[in-house]
Amino acid sequence: MADNLAPRRKKMRLIAEARYERIPEFIDVRGHLIAQLLPKVRKSVPNWQAQEDKILFVDSEKQPADEFVIAFNRMSVILEDPHSVNEFADIARSKLRLAHEVIGKDIPTIARFGVRFISIFDAPEFHTHAQLTKHIAEATIRIPDAVPLKPTDSLVRLVHDQGVITIGPASQGEE
């Protein structure tokens, strides 16, 4: 699928996260995890830090763009400005698989798995809420012809340095 918003995107961060039941022995196995994982991930995320509730592997301590987190109740891969979504998917799959090989026996079930896309856009030509809402809906909402859905509403939540903007009516008539 073509990325219609790519020319306007200033930054993008993709996050893949698996959540699971807490591992009670996590504090006791952190050293083992680091010893097993560091040789395999050192090329992309050479810096690591063991904290009370997680182990953080990063490519840079000052401004990380590639992060790999293993915690007592979740593991995640965070990548900033990947070349493509496929590149991100390959990296996330690889790192999550490595972690699962080491601590998978302690995780009976993955309770939730999710992927988040966070983007920052440059859109100086939009001066009103209605203009921006219409543009976002037209540029991002694509429903395949085979799916018999006709959207009647949309909602986009944008968090910025001064607060939060919610774009789109929450229900019919709130336009």
Question: For the regions a protein language model found, what residue spans apply to each?
Answer:
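N-terminal low-complexity, intrinsically disordered segments
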Residues: 1-80
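Intrinsically disordered, low-complexity regulatory regions enriched in serine/threonine/proline
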Residues: 1-11, 91, 107-111, 160-175
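Short, conserved charged micro-motifs
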Residues: 23-29, 86-88, 126-128
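General N-terminal targeting signals
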Residues: 33, 87, 94, 132-134
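Hydrophobic, Leu/Ile/Phe/Ala-enriched alpha-helical segments that form helix-helix packing faces
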Residues: 33-45, 95-103, 140
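Short C-terminal domain-edge/linker segments immediately following a structured domain
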Residues: 45-51, 107-111, 145-151
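Aromatic- and glycine-enriched beta-alpha-beta binding-site module
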Residues: 78-122
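Aromatic/basic-lined ligand-recognition segments
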Residues: 112-175
